[in-house]
A protein has these predicted regions:
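Acidic catalytic/metal-coordinating carboxylates
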Residues: 39-40, 66-70
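Acidic, metal-coordinating helix/loop segments flanking the phosphotransfer/catalytic sites
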Residues: 37-55
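The C-terminal output helix
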Residues: 121-136
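Receiver (REC) domain active-site loop signature in two-component systems and cognate sites
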Residues: 62
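C-terminal output helix
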Residues: 93, 111-121
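Two-component/phosphorelay signaling modules centered on CheY-like receiver
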Residues: 18-36, 123
Length: 143
């Protein structure tokens, strides 16, 4: 699927729950986008997909590196990727932190496909530069 003169956006899903990853991937593909899945923030950070990602859907609470820590890492690398957070926990402090740091949305599980679609549409707003892959300064960075 082409969007104007730009390639089909790649949406990356980072969640330690495989069933959540699979469900979101199926939905993303059903609306015509490419989807890549990662079981951890670390796997996403070392993947070649990072530089192709137009939108990141990430769980807040994961082992080793949380979604908020991933957001902070990407910010420190100057990666401009729109982020949609998802969580099963009612955590107003995490929500406030994520949105203050520039997250597109913060969805509480279970959320509807319409909720996710609206967040994706905001993240991929063609008025901005969101359909373009991420831009990052990664040289010399470690996680």
């Amino acid at each position: 699927m082409q969007h104007g003169n730009l390639k089909t956006p790649v949406l990356s899903i980072v969640d330690d729950d495989e069933s959540v990853r699979e469900a979101i991937k199926g939905f993303i593909q059903s609306i015509g986008f490419k989807a890549e899945m990662f079981q951890s923030a670390q796997n996403f950070l070392v993947s070649d997909i990072l530089k192709q990602t137009s939108c990141l859907i990430v769980d807040v609470h994961m082992p080793v590196m949380t979604g908020l820590e991933l957001q902070s890492r990407l910010t420190s690398w100057r990666c401009r990727i729109p982020i949609i957070f998802i969580t099963a926990h009612d955590d107003p402090a995490a929500r406030a932190q994520a949105l203050k740091a520039g997250a597109v949305d913060f969805l509480r599980k279970p959320f509807t496909e319409d909720d996710l679609l609206r967040a994706i549409q905001v993240a991929l707003d063609p008025v901005g530069d969101s359909y373009r892959p991420a831009t990052c300064t990664l040289i010399g960075k470690q996680f």
